[in-house]
Amino acid sequence: MKKTALLNAPLSQVIATLGHTDSLTICDAGLPIPKQIERVDLALSAGVPSFLQTFHAVVTEMFVERAIIAEEIKEKNPKILTALLNSLAQLEQQQGNQIEVQYVSHDMFKTYTHASKAIVRSGECSPYANIILYSGVPF
């Protein structure tokens, strides 16, 4: 059995196969997932697992160099945004790099998900709790 934090085999496999600049989307329960993109559905019930729990599990195994977030989160979900930005700042410290954060419209965000290697669906039921993470290299 693995002894790292991330135990979900399909999610662990997706992260293990990411190359430099590949993207992985973590989303709330409502984001549309394109049929051609691999879906890692972790949602069990409303709020389980939360978006932030899912984010924290993913970044235990993924080196992140940049992120995209929907602009609308600033107004519609500031609590999640604040927690997410704090988590990204902590991740920068752990990784020893700067993580570029870009804001785009929600419509543009949905377009960008079409290029993701996979989309990880959480049980989060709050608006705009979504992020696209781009893989970096830890050297």
Curated annotation (Swiss-Prot):
Gene Ontology CC annotations of this record: cytosol
Q: Which Pfam families match?
A: RbsD_FucU
Q: What is its EC number?
A: 5.4.99.62
- Give the GO terms filed under biological process for this record: D-ribose catabolic process
| Chain residues that bind substrate | D28, H106, Y128, A129, N130
User: Per UniProt, which keywords does this protein have?
Assistant: Carbohydrate metabolism, Cytoplasm, Isomerase
Identification of the protein by name: D-ribose pyranase
Q: Which organism is it from?
A: Pasteurella multocida (strain Pm70)
Lineage, highest ranks first: Bacteria, Pseudomonadati, Pseudomonadota, Gammaproteobacteria, Pasteurellales
